[in-house]
């Protein structure tokens, strides 16, 4: 079981990189992380083995981490948002976020 921080981190990465995953990978990720179904429940629903679900979701998580390691989109967004908190001009922050 993932701790909450890693779970939310993977969900954030999924929001960024889901377009790089297959339809099946997205479906299993959604069922597990957003619908909160267990591997067993997904396996029963999709009529495949629990280990196939586990393998697929482990691969998805590995892929998401590799994409972030290479592209750093999440990290750059986080740094940018941290910098926004240092700016006292709310209009400027709004304009920067709109870019």
From Swiss-Prot:
Gene3D superfamilies named among the record's database cross-references: Winged helix-like DNA-binding domain superfamily/Winged helix DNA-binding domain (1.10.10.10)
Top-rank taxon:
Bacteria
Q: InterPro entries attached here?
A: RNA_pol_sigma_r3/r4-like, UPF0122, WH-like_DNA-bd_sf
NCBIfam families to which the protein is assigned, alphabetical:
PRK00118.2-3
Q: What does this protein do?
A: Might take part in the signal recognition particle (SRP) pathway. This is inferred from the conservation of its genetic proximity to ftsY/ffh. May be a regulatory protein.
Q: Which family does it belong to?
A: Belongs to the UPF0122 family.
Check the record and name the HAMAP family matching this protein.
UPF0122
Q: In its UniProt entry, what is this protein called?
A: UPF0122 protein UU142
Tell me the organism.
Ureaplasma parvum serovar 3 (strain ATCC 700970)
